[in-house]
Amino acid sequence: DDFAWESGSNVLSQPPYSFDLSVMDWVPALLSHGTLKALPKQTADDFKSLFKTLPTLNLHKWVSTPSFADVALLDPEFKQSVHPNLSAFFFCGEVLTKTTAEKLLARFPDAHIYNTYGPTEATVAVTSIPITQAVIANNNKMPIGYVKADTEIVIQDADGEMVADGEPGEIIIVGPSVSRGYL
């Protein structure tokens, strides 16, 4: 619900299914009666083949690491006019750089870009933020967003005490998406 995922979307399925990021493509796609557009590893690894294949997929949703988007951005034809139905990008698993965000917004002005955070044990995206021109203008590093409603995140020191804002510590995630066995 957080991402307004439309029914029947064509969804890029690029991450290997052993990578927790893949949950962000196949679960919403299946729940919304969408179609997974699987990208074979050999296609993803061969830029010429990748650049030729992407426009044929008629994508609506893009789920990947930011570095995979950086590869796609090497193709000058990776833009809204060539991918008119591509309405949203979802990133997790790596840092989304300001440069990547700027390039995507410039090339896909009608698309929504979401930066998310969430480790494997917390079932991937426990935070998210729409990346807009204002977010880019006001941040040197792209923020990971706000905690979803059913989750709590706190930062603790080595003794389990809460730390002051801006102080280093361990990220503690509490909520129903945290896998069993994690404390």
Language-model regions: role of each:
Residues 1-165, 170-179:
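Motif- and composition-driven signal specific to adenylation
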